[in-house]
């Protein structure tokens, strides 16, 4: 199992992530799974919502781009 730090580095390098790896990063950022309908999960933290669509093995690039912004915000403070 990869640590969250390694998963963040993998994300920032531009590598593909599985939905399970994305969930670990979201939990580390303080997000909590609020609800799920089908393959779409709604994660909430501090009034912000993040939707994770799990349609296949790898998460689509546009979701990874949004997650990358969240990780960079946490790093910058």
Residue ranges and their predicted role:
Residues 38-39:
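Ligand-recognition elements built from short beta-strands and adjacent flexible loops
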Residues 1-35, 44-77:
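Basic nucleic-acid-binding interfaces
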